[in-house]
Curated annotation (Swiss-Prot):
It comes from Saccharomyces cerevisiae (strain RM11-1a) (Baker's yeast). GO terms for biological process: eisosome assembly. GO terms for cellular component: plasma membrane. The modification N-acetylserine is found at S2. Residues 13-44, 120-174, 717-843 are annotated as: Disordered. This is Eisosome protein 1. It is found in: Cytoplasmic granule; Cell membrane. Keywords: Acetylation, Cell membrane, Membrane, Phosphoprotein. Residues 127-137, 163-174, 798-810 have a biased composition (Polar residues). The keyword Signal does not apply. Residues 781-797 have a biased composition (Basic and acidic residues). It is a peripheral membrane protein. Residues 33-44 have a biased composition (Basic residues).
Length: 843
């Protein structure tokens, strides 16, 4: 939430002029009149807290800074000049006179009237010489009386001494020593420049000071005569053209330079340096004066600084001790020497008696006269521009004559316009009078027309009423005759209507009896047609019902097979866990046997046993490895069997889904044939539309019946084929088991050869698998055991069952029943065992 409320547009010009109660204006030089005028137009801003209280000054100040509203001199509209037309000239003059320094800025905005008032309100400072006061007998009394009044002077002297230390003065001023009373006298003399009167005490007449003052006054008057000040405020910005006319002034420095034969640029540089030092000294004097004026409003009896009072007391005691005649003589000698130096340096006394000075003055006067003749009989337009009266008249004529011509043209146009306006007004008045007369005639004619039309309407009304009455009577008589005729006609039509109703009732009875007889005959005929159509429908739908029953029976068998496969899968998983446990046991035995072999090797080295005992131990190791390979082979066969059973379960599920869809399709076909049969019977047709049946089913009813008969035969032959395939599989399984038992016995056949045969049989099975189009193992790896023959034989069963299913399912391609699955990768345990056996043989 904002600290201040929104400012209205009418209050924007008042913001920044004044703050809350007791605030001062931004400018010191604004007068009382402008302040009064500004205070009337000011309006207090609406700034409140959420509780309704006014904001503090700090909050107002921060809010103004935040929103860009700041009390600055640029926003104080009461400051300025009284005449708005002279504002630009005033601003230009101030900008030309003002020096771009901080002190000049302060100096420009300090009202001299304020300093005068402050100096008048302060205590009068009495000028007193330290030497004369020391010699006088009443000096101590005057000092004791002046102690209470010296505190403002002491502060001023301190400020003056501080400024004197920082500024660079000439060697003459640096060699002098000032006392406190002399500093106060200097301040009093400076304050006299601001029209502050000094009233010294009566004392002995000092003619030297009077003569010095007269000489200075004479010098100033001569300077004013030689270099008169020319004011140039009439045409805008003040320029320095009049000051450049007399570049050589007969001052002390100029005369010294002429006598010393110094070049003009160097003399100008020296003059500038001295001018800068004089300005600095004047600034220090003004600063001291400002400090003195600043302390005048304080109590004169109170000491501002005790150290200053202590220094003044010490100096008084020191000066009281210097009352000897020697000091006075030295002081007088110094004063005389200084006066002699001043008289010698004053070259103006020799001004009119020195021929060189006169020659230089004549040369300067001639040069100035030549410069002035350039601007003779010319008017200064300001900014260094001088024009002759002829040029001014020419410029004025060039600027004013077009304006006068334009004025005359506009006056002529205005006169023509006035004449045209007068003519138009006269014509308008004439037309207005004519229109008014016409309106009056129209009104009178309208009144006459109204009366005549009213009379005519009355007469026409009477005649029309009489005509209407006569016509109405004739119409009534004519309508009465017509009504009598219509009544007679109505009686005749009523009698005819009664006779017609009787005739129609008799005809309706006869027609109803005939229709009842026809309906009975048609019902009997329809019943016969329905019985015949039902017989035909049963004959047509019999193969569909048979197919539906066969499909449901096959679905039940497939569900039973799936349950058997799931049971076999669980049994195989248990067997796989058992085999894995045995393999881990054999692995532990192998580790123990390895440790035992290591120990036996050590013992052989130590005891030197025979080769037979070593071979017997190695044969034990080989037997254990063979048992492990056997268990791993059984594990791989069980895993292959498990994968194959999973594949069988997936195929059975797919076939069950397919049978379900076929059952639904056959049901829909039966419903379709029944509906078509009903439609044909309703139409009275003996047969179904074979073309429509062919479009919907894809074949005619006769073809469909023949195809269903062949399917029934195939379904009847399927169980016998499956039994034969199962018997062949059992025989092959027994042969494989017998071979495994022979290989496991180890009599006359080493284990390594058995493992090699197993790998060969597994590779042979892999070559047969692509022929059967069922990918069971990983094609890239030839690391399968010998018992994969079982999976190959089982794949034959699957292919046979697939063929049987394809023969049963009509309208479905055999490729749609193929179920692709990712083959499982068996571990390379057999080859690892062979590698281990070969390593043992090498050892």
């Amino acid at each position: 939430m904002s600290l201040i409320s929104a400012v209205e547009d009418r209050d924007i010009h008042n913001i920044g002029k004044t703050s809350g109660g007791g605030s001062r204006t931004s400018s010191i030089t604004s007068s009382k009149k402008s302040l009064k005028h500004g205070s009337k137009s000011l309006r207090k801003p609406k700034v409140y807290q959420t509780t309704g209280e006014l904001l503090s000054r700090e909050a107002l100040y921060k809010a103004k800074l935040k929103y860009g509203v700041y009390q600055s001199p640029a926003q104080s509209y009461s400051i300025g000049v009284s005449d708005a037309h002279a504002a630009s000239d005033k601003a230009a003059n101030l900008a030309h006179d003002n020096q771009t320094t901080v002190e000049a800025y302060k100096r420009m905005f300090i009202d001299p009237n304020a300093t005068k008032a402050a100096s008048k309100m302060g205590p009068k400072v009495v000028r007193n010489n330290s030497i004369t006061s020391a010699t006088s007998k009443t000096s101590k009394e005057s000092q004791t009386k002046r102690k209470s009044k010296e505190s403002p002077g002491a502060a001023a002297s301190k400020a003056y001494s501080m400024t004197m230390e920082t500024t660079s003065l000439s060697s003459q001023t640096n060699s002098r020593s000032y006392s406190i009373t002399s500093a106060s006298s200097v301040l009093s003399g400076a304050s006299g420049s601001f029209n502050s009167t000094v009233n010294p005490k009566p004392k002995t007449l000092n003619l030297e000071k009077v003569l010095v003052g007269a000489e200075k006054k004479a010098e100033s008057r001569i300077k004013e005569r030689w270099e008169p000040e020319k004011t140039n405020f009439q045409y805008g910005v003040k320029t320095d053209e009049h000051g450049n006319l007399n570049q050589f002034s007969f001052s002390n420095e100029m005369m010294n330079n002429i006598m010393a034969k110094v070049d003009a640029p160097k003399a100008q540089d020296l003059q500038k340096v001295k001018k800068v030092s004089a300005e600095k000294e004047a600034k220090s004097m003004k600063f001291a004066l400002g400090a003195a004026n600043a302390v005048k409003d304080m109590h004169p009896g109170e000491d501002i600084d005790k150290s200053i009072a202590l220094k003044a007391q010490k100096r008084e005691t020191y000066l009281s001790q210097l009352t000897s005649q020697q000091v006075l003589t030295l002081a007088r000698a110094n004063v005389d020497r200084q006066l002699d130096i001043i008289e010698k340096s004053d070259m103006h006394r020799k001004l009119f008696t020195n021929m060189e000075y006169n020659k230089a003055a004549v040369a300067v006067a001639q040069s100035n006269h030549q410069k002035k003749t350039e601007f003779h009989n010319k008017i200064n337009m300001g900014g260094g521009l001088f024009l002759s009266p002829e040029d001014i008249t020419k410029i004025a004529s060039g600027l004013i004559s077009p304006v006068l011509g334009e004025v005359s043209e506009r006056a002529e146009a205005q006169r023509a316009m006035d004449e045209e306006i007068a003519e138009r007004t006269e014509a308008y008045n004439k037309s207005l009078n004519e229109w008014e007369t016409m309106e009056r005639s129209i009104i009178s004619n309208d009144a006459k027309v109204l009366t005549t039309t009213a009379n005519r309407h009355q007469t026409e009304k009477k005649t029309s009423q009489e005509k209407i009455k006569a016509s109405f009577d004739a119409l009534v008589a004519r309508m009465d005759t017509k009504v009598a005729e219509r009544e007679t006609l109505l009686e005749d039509t009523k009698s005819k209507e009664i006779e017609f109703k009787k005739q129609m009732q008799q005809e309706l009875k006869d027609e109803k009896a005939r229709l009842d007889q026809d309906l009975e005959e048609w019902g009997k005929k329809c019943e016969q047609d329905i019985t015949e159509a039902r017989k035909e429908q049963e004959e047509l739908l019999k193969p569909y019902h048979d197919d539906l029953a066969n499909a449901e029976a096959e679905h039940k068998t497939l569900v039973e097979e799936r349950d058997e496969i799931n049971a076999e899968i669980s049994r195989l998983q248990d067997a796989i866990v058992d085999h894995k446990r045995k393999i881990s046991g054999y692995g532990n035995d192998l580790d123990a046997q390895k440790n035992r072999n290591i120990r036996e090797d050590d013992k052989l080295l130590e005891l030197g046993q025979t080769k037979e005992s070593l071979e017997s131990h190695l044969n034990d190791d080989v037997i254990i490895l063979a048992n492990k390979a056997k268990e791993q082979a059984e594990l791989s066969t069980k895993e292959a069997r498990l994968k194959q059973l999973e594949v069988d379960s997936l195929i059975n599920e797919r076939k069950s889904e397919l049978n379900a869809t076929e059952i639904e399709l056959k049901k829909e076909k039966l419903n379709l044939l029944e509906a078509m049969k009903d439609v044909a019977s309703a139409r009275g047709d003996d047969k179904i539309d074979e073309e429509k049946v062919k479009k919907l089913i894809g074949m005619t009813s006769e073809e469909y019946l023949t195809q269903n008969k062949s399917v029934e035969k195939n379904v009847e032959d399927l169980p016998t084929q499956l039994e034969k395939i199962e018997e062949g599989d059992e025989l092959k399984k027994e042969e494989i088991v017998g071979a495994e038992t022979k290989n496991s016995g180890g009599d006359g056949v080493p284990v390594s050869t058995a493992a090699k045969e197993a790998t060969e049989t597994s590779s042979a099975v892999q070559t047969k698998e692509p022929e059967e189009k069922i990918s069971i193992g990983n094609k890239s790896s030839g690391k399968e055991d010998a018992n994969d023959c079982k999976s190959a034989e089982h794949s034959k069963e699957i292919s046979v069952s697939q063929k049987a299913g394809n023969n049963k399912s009509l309208g479905v391609s055999p490729d749609s029943l193929e179920h692709t699955f990712s083959g499982f990768s068996q571990g390379s345990s057999i080859e690892d065992d062979q590698d281990a056996i070969s390593n043992q043989e090498k050892k």
